[in-house]
């Protein structure tokens, strides 16, 4: 043996293995087929516009609004002709923030005080919701085909359809909540892209908390949109809370995936403060800004309560205008909190939240069965009912169960995000089940149900390691289901739009005893 052999540390041993670098997520920050994606989105949006605007001005109640349109259409008209505030002469109090009525007023300004006028803005928002759901599904599934499927499903959803064609506030709440969700999905991808580049630059472990992520404009946009949601209905606050927690969890997981030494503490140190600003201060500022006409008015409801219902002195140096707004807000809250069954408040179409996932107790917005012509039978019926398309809503429980399993067991963030959105519109209502409630509160749940179904269909289409026969079977299954939903929607179309049908057909449309 030579000296060289004995002096070599690796003599007589195999070559050492090189330790691999830490495993990080692949650089996947969104779909890449942008041209195809936008072409598909344009087609789906055009289809949505046709369905939402076709014969939009009908039906009416002898030329007047139907159901709760009787509140919001007149209030929007007052907004239009009273410097942006409601006179509200026919009711004791205006009990919802102003943004929804301000948007309804745009349509009334364009087309006048008629069915088209007071429903126009809602229909525009309904089309935007379809576009947003399409884009969200495409982004989180990384599939333009799945995005198209989601778009078709939301077009054919009875709840989303009817809410887009009536002058209630819920469609505006849905649009702002879904738009905020869309912003947060883009923000999630952007955060991971920034973390990826920080990893390549060696900046991940510069501190125990990981890198700062810079200005996050998509998340800022989500804060603005959530403020508009709260300024439409106070239930928008639930989405502020649920989405705020969701994005912080996303941040912590991203830091963990890119091997930040202390990811959760890093999230608390780096991300919690900016998130509090985006989900706290920004929505509050937007909410206050929506009351600008009220602040500027001399005659708005409760505008000058300091010195009347409120004492002139205050412990904190709060401007009188804000104190008056707080008094007004508290009066509206008192109205809602006292609207309970125990106090004798009942409505023939009220429902409780456990009936909402399967659309077990819909809402009849309008019905006319007296001397109605046009159906070819002796007895005709015209009705508008807010009801979910059964092919989707009747399977809500297994869909949600599957989504929960995918979230908890398979750690599939896509299903988790969709569940957060769904539960934000569902769970908080269980806090006071004695309150008078209606199925139209569940309108905001519909887009997230559609997203969950679209993800499941996408998993059927793109299940890995499938042989050609199983892939073909999966494609046929998805096509059959989408066709079933569209057929179901077409069958129910008359009771969603107020078209005249025979009494026999009406009885066939009402599937469940609880629908009567």
From Swiss-Prot:
Task: State what the entry records as the consequence of deleting this gene.
Answer: Loss of DNA conjugation when disrupted in recipient strain, strain does not secrete EsxB.
Give me the Gene Ontology terms describing cellular component: plasma membrane
Q: Where in the cell is it found?
A: Cell membrane
Q: Where is this region: Disordered?
A: 1-23
EC numbers, comma separated: 2.4.1.-
Q: Which UniProt keywords apply?
A: Cell membrane, Glycosyltransferase, Membrane, Transferase, Transmembrane, Transmembrane helix
- TM spans (from-to): 113-133, 143-163, 166-186, 234-254, 275-295, 384-404, 413-433, 437-457, 473-493
Leader sequence range is none
Any idea what job this protein has? Answer: Protein O-mannosyltransferase that catalyzes the transfer of a single mannose residue from a polyprenol phospho-mannosyl lipidic donor to the hydroxyl group of selected serine and threonine residues in acceptor proteins. Involved in DNA conjugation, in at least the recipient strain.
The name this protein goes by in its record: Polyprenol-phosphate-mannose--protein mannosyltransferase
Origin species, per record, is Mycolicibacterium smegmatis (strain MKD8)
Name the gene for this chain: pmt
């Amino acid at each position: 043996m030579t000296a060289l052999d004995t002096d070599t540390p690796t003599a007589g041993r195999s070559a050492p293995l090189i330790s691999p670098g830490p495993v990080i997520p692949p650089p996947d920050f969104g779909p890449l087929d942008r041209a195809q994606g936008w072409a598909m989105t344009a087609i789906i949006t055009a289809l949505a516009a046709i369905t939402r605007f076709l014969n939009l001005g009908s039906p009416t109640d002898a030329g007047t609004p139907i159901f709760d349109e009787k509140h919001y259409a007149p209030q929007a008209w007052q907004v239009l002709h009273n410097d942006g505030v409601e006179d509200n002469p026919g009711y004791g109090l205006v009990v919802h923030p102003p943004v929804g009525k301000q948007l309804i007023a745009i349509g009334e300004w364009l087309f006048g005080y008629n069915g088209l006028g007071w429903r126009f803005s809602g229909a525009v928002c309904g089309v935007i919701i379809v576009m947003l759901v399409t884009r969200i599904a495409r982004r989180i599934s990384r599939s333009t085909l799945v995005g198209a499927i989601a778009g078709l499903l939301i077009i054919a959803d009875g709840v989303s359809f009817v809410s887009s064609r009536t002058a209630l506030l819920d469609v505006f709440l849905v649009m702002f909540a879904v738009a905020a969700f869309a912003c947060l999905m883009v923000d999630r991808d952007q955060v991971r892209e920034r973390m990826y580049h920080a990893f390549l630059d060696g900046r991940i472990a510069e501190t125990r908390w990981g890198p700062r992520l810079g200005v996050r404009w998509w998340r800022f946009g989500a804060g603005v949109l959530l403020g508009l949601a709260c300024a439409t209905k106070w239930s928008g606050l639930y989405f502020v809370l649920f989405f705020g927690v969701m994005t912080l969890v996303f941040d912590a997981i991203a830091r963990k995936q890119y091997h930040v030494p202390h990811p959760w503490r890093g999230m608390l140190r780096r991300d919690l403060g900016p998130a509090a600003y985006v989900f706290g201060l920004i929505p509050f500022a937007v909410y206050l800004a929506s009351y600008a006409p009220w602040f500027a008015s001399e005659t708005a409801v409760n505008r000058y309560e300091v010195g009347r219902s409120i004492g002139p002195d205050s412990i904190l140096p709060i401007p009188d205008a804000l104190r008056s707004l707080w008094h007004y807000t508290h009066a509206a809250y008192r109205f809602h909190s006292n609207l309970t069954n125990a106090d004798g408040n009942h409505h023939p179409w009220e429902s409780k939240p456990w009936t909402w996932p399967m659309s077990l107790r819909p809402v009849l917005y309008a019905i006319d069965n007296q001397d109605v012509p046009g159906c070819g039978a002796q007895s005709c019926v015209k009705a508008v009912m807010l009801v979910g398309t059964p092919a989707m809503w009747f399977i809500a429980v297994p869909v949600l169960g599957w989504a929960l399993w995918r979230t908890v067991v398979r750690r599939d963030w896509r299903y988790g995000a969709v569940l957060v959105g769904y539960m934000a519109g569902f769970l908080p209502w269980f806090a006071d089940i004695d309150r008078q409630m209606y199925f139209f509160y569940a309108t905001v749940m519909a887009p997230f149900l559609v997203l969950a179904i679209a993800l499941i269909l996408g998993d059927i289409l793109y299940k890995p390691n499938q042989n050609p026969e199983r892939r073909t079977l999966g494609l046929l299954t998805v096509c059959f289901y989408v066709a079933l939903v569209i057929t179901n929607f077409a069958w129910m179309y008359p009771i969603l739009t107020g078209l005249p049908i025979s009494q026999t057909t009406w009885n066939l449309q009402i599937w469940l005893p609880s629908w009567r």
